[in-house]
Structure formats: C-alpha cells, structure tokens
A protein has these predicted regions:
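Conserved phosphate-handling catalytic cores of large alpha/beta enzymes
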Residues: 170
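A short, basic N-terminal segment
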Residues: 1-20, 47-50, 60-61, 220-228
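C-terminal engagement/docking regions of AAA+ P-loop ATPases
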Residues: 2, 6-15, 229-290, 324-328, ...
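Walker A/P-loop NTP-binding motif of AAA+ ATPase domains
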Residues: 22-30, 39-142, 146-151, 161-166, ...
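AAA+ ATPase "lid" subdomain C-terminal helix
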Residues: 189-215, 433-489
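Conserved ASCE P-loop NTPase core motifs with emphasis on AAA+ ATPases
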Residues: 210-241, 340
C-alpha cells in the first residue's frame, strides 16, 4: 500500500511533468521535513535541486537529505522583500522553490493574488526547470486562481502506516508488542500528522515505562490538544444502554452490522448521518455517546461554536481538521450536541459569512465522504435546522414522553447501581404513576439525590458500610414531591407541545408499550379505539 509520502511525491511529479510549474501543498506545519523529503525524492526524479524559504530565514535555503533533512543558506536574500516570488524568478537559480506561509493572508491580500498570477505566467513563458510550491496548513484558493494553483493535500498517515510506525517504535525501544496494545496506540494516534506522532511517541517512551499506561498517555495528549479546537474525545458512559428505546436500539444494531466487512461485500454501507430529535432531558446525548460503544468505534464530540475562530481561515482550518481527524480515525462517530444552535444566522452573512462557509463544508462532507464515519446530531427544535441539512440525515428518531414500560427500565438501570431493593408489582405501579411525565434525566437526578441522602444519613449516624443501602419506596415518593417536572411547567410544556406536534416527521425511539405496566387504552363511550385488539395490559 502506497504511503502518504510516496503519494505526495507521485502527485507533485505528475504536476511537474505535465508542465504545471506552480502548485500548492496543504500540510500540517509539523510535517515540514516530511514534505521536503517527498519533494527531494521528486526532484531527484527530474534532476533538480530543492530550495526552501519562510519569513524566519533571511536567505533562501538549499535543501539536502541524507539521514535527515538539512538546510543551508544560499546567496539569495529574501527577508523584507515585498515580492519574494518575483525576486526568486529574477535569479538564475533553477530548481523547486518551496515557500511556506505566503498563503496565510491570501484571501485578503490583493497584491499576493497578482504576484501568484504573475509568477505562473513567468514560469510558463521561460521554459526552464523552475517550479514554485506554496506550502500552507489550510489553503483556500479563489476560483480565478484555481487552474493556476492546483493544491495537493498531504494528509495524516493511514491506520496501516500508523501500525507500522508503532511497531517500529516499540521494537526500537525494546518493548514487546501485543494486539491490544497495538490497537489502542493506533486508535490514540489516528488523525495526527507524521511529525506529531513521532513527537508523542518520543515523549511517551521517555515518560512512561509501564506498557499498559502508554495508550492512556497518547490519548491524554490528544484530548488536551483537541480541547482548544472545539473537539473532545469523551470517556465512555458508565452505563451500557439507554433504557426504553427499543426502536433506536434496532436502528443502532443495523448501523453496527453495516460497519461489518460483510456489508461491503453486498455493496451496503452505513448511513452517513443520524438525527436524534426531541424533548430536552430524554437521553438524546447519552444515546449518541453510547452509539459509538455499540458500533465499536471512536467517539469524537465537536462543539460547533468553538470551531468558529477569529477569522474565516482559522474557522475553516478548524472544521477541516475535525473532518480530517474523523476520516482518518477508522470506524468513528462524529457527535454534535444541540446541533440547531450551529445554524442560527448561518445564511445571513453573520460573522463575515464564516458560518455559511463552515455549514457548506459540512454539508459537502456529509454528502461525499466515504470513510467509515457516521455523524450523530441531537436537536431540540427541528424547525431551526435548514431543509438542506435535514435531508442529509438518513435516520431521524424522535424522543418524546416515555411510556410506563420504558420508565420502569430507566428506574431499573439507576436503582440497580445505587441500592438494594425488592419492589412488588403494586409498588412499581405506584412509583411509575408518581413519576409519570418525568424525563429520564429527571429520574436519574431523583435517584442520585436519594442515594446522596442515604449516604449522608449513614455517615452522620455512624452506621455507614460499603454495601449498597436498602431502599424503601416511600423515600423515592418523598423525593418526587420536591420538584416539578419540566413537562408540568407552563412555559416549558408549551415548548414540549410544539416539539411533539412535529413528531410525525420522525420515527419514535420506543415502540408500543408491551410491558406489564402498559396503560390500558380506555374506550370512548364503550367504543374500542382502532387497533385496540392488542394484548390487554394491567392498568397502572
């Protein structure tokens, strides 16, 4: 399999041999030596030297490579020169001139626009072995310059390449490898550029001596780095499933199977996007986070507002980095919470049109990407999402008020973690009736409060033991009296009603209540409702 470095050499050579004298390479700053090494290989193919310059060097640098890249001053001074490209082209030097940083202010610099255009035509007319490569970490070429300045992208290494790097590093540092260690390290390093992987591995081997702790070091580095760019790698939730969501479970199981190699053999592919929509506090975010665990992929959470930078260039660099990260992370879930907030004013030119450009980039990626990534977004208000965005979601699930059977499952999950209890069927009926209309989040909070109260009681009485405390129904009922469910508050209930009125646009996360706690559908004036021939349940 061809490495990214070999591909860069081949792509640039193709441009050079097709008489394209001017090009750009988009690469991470940390990968400079890798880019120069690839161009040195390309230069050897066509027998031309490589030169490099950025504003930190007074003179143009001659590039050579033996064991590593080395730079040496030439006689050509470029610092403090307004038009460095024209200065280069006025010399007698021949070769490949790699200029870094010139495109940083490209969008707002009319003189630079003209200089690049002039450089293209000068190179084209002279018919000499001279090439200019403009290097930047985020390149956005305007339409008029697009045919003059083709862009080659030097992307992070593939998982196969990272595996080879990891194995070589473990061997060099005299550590034995095993499949689990290799898998965890590759997962933690995925999405990083070559140069950054090398730095992280060097730091890891110098600071961590215990093999089992090595993946954690790499992952901690990655988390800290991404945090400043609006990206997080959340820890796995402390529960295995979201209760009472049988229909959503079926969808997630389908998606899991569509990520299997057998699906590709049949020409099937996983969905590109799933939308979880509905009432606040119903478990949308938790369901999205658990989906990564269910599918067996990496969870990458993004905060849209934090992706917006101080400039269009910074903002586009952030979203490009995010999409490159998930595309190179193997099986992955890209998670956006409260996604509708990202599109407030997106088409109105707010913030210089940056929101529109970012949204356009995401829309294009959702449509075109072929990597094993599913985007899962949660929203409260469907009407705040643009129609062209809604169309990109292949599955839309609605989270509404949960029925008695689902509420019973929610209680079971939280009670089993915190208490010993033995409720009779009648006691369960009483509990579910008291908490009817509460969201899963409100149930979880109530159980947590009761667990805290029992802990405080036992500590103060001197009767504390590490065993789970015995729970009585009356304590949970008393806790219910201390709060008003959101669904009962006028302002919030109106918002919930508005959300539920649009629920027909999506598939509910739970099907009909088939539990023993299902509420009997009471007939009107003795006339059964249509479809009421289903099994009669015990009334709550």
């Amino acid at each position: 399999m061809q490495s990214q470095k070999d591909r860069l050499t081949a792509d640039w050579l193709t441009l050079a041999q097709s008489k394209q004298p001017l090009s750009a390479i988009e690469a991470a700053e940390i990968d400079l030596d890798h880019v120069l090494a690839a161009l040195v290989s390309g230069g050897e193919e066509i027998d031309v030297p490589i030169y490099f310059w950025n504003v930190g060097y007074p003179y143009l640098q001659s590039v050579s490579k033996t064991e590593a890249i080395s730079l040496k001053d030439t006689a050509t001074r470029l610092r403090d020169i307004e038009f460095p490209l024209q200065t280069l082209l006025s010399t007698t030097l021949q070769g490949v001139f790699v200029i870094s940083g010139l495109l940083n202010d490209f969008a707002s610099h009319q003189k630079l626009y003209q200089e690049i255009s002039n450089a293209f035509y000068t190179l084209k007319r002279n018919h000499r072995s001279r090439y200019i490569v403009l290097l930047g970490d985020s390149i956005d070429v305007s339409l008029p310059l697009y045919p003059l300045l083709p862009v080659v992208r030097f992307t992070p290494p593939s998982k196969t390449e990272i595996t080879n790097i990891v194995l070589a590093s473990l061997l060099e540092n005299q550590y034995e490898s095993n499949d689990e260690l290799k898998r965890q390290l590759v997962q933690a390093l995925s999405g990083m550029p070559y140069g950054e992987i090398e730095i992280v591995l060097r730091q890891m081997f110098s600071k961590v001596s215990e093999v089992a702790l090595m993946p954690g070091f790499a992952l901690a580095y990655k988390r800290e780095k991404l945090k400043g760019r609006g990206i997080a790698l959340p820890a796995e939730p402390d529960i295995d499933r979201v209760a009472g969501m049988d229909e959503l479970d079926r969808t997630m199981d389908k998606i899991r199977l569509l990520f299997q190699p057998e699906a590709e053999a049949r020409g099937r592919r996983p969905p590109k996007a799933v939308l979880l929509w509905g009432i606040p506090g119903t478990g949308k975010s938790l369901a999205a986070k658990l989906s990564a665990k269910r599918i067996g992929g990496t969870l990458v959470a993004a905060d849209w507002n934090s992706l917006v930078g101080q400039s269009v260039q910074e903002s586009m660099a952030n979203i490009n980095h995010l999409l490159d990260l998930v595309d190179s992370s193997g099986t992955c879930v890209l998670f956006f919470d409260e996604f509708e907030k990202a599109f407030h004013g997106w088409d109105s030119g707010v913030q210089g049109g940056v929101l529109g450009k970012m949204a356009g980039k995401l829309l294009s990626w959702m449509q075109d990407h072929t990597s094993p990534v599913v985007m899962i977004a949660t929203i409260n208000r469907l009407n705040l999402l643009p129609a062209e965005m809604i169309r990109r979601f292949e599955y839309v699930h609605f989270f509404g008020s949960i029925h008695a059977g689902a509420l019973h499952e929610v209680f079971k999950i939280h009670l089993d973690k915190n208490f010993r209890y033995d409720f009779s069927f009648k006691e369960w009926q009483i509990l579910l009736r008291e908490y009817r209309g509460c969201t899963p989040a409100e149930v979880a909070k109530a159980v947590q409060h009761v667990a805290d109260d029992l802990y405080f009681r036992d500590i103060k009485s001197g009767e504390f033991t590490p065993d789970l405390p015995q729970l009585e129904l009356a304590i949970l009922i008393a806790e219910r009296r201390t709060f008003t469910p959101a669904s009962s508050q006028r302002e919030i209930s109106d918002q919930i009603a508005e959300i539920q009125n649009m629920a027909e646009y999506a598939k509910p996360v739970c099907g009909p209540d088939q539990s023993d706690f299902a509420v009997i559908d009471q007939p009107l004036m003795g006339i059964p409702h249509s479809g009421s021939a289903q099994k009669i349940k015990r009334a709550v």
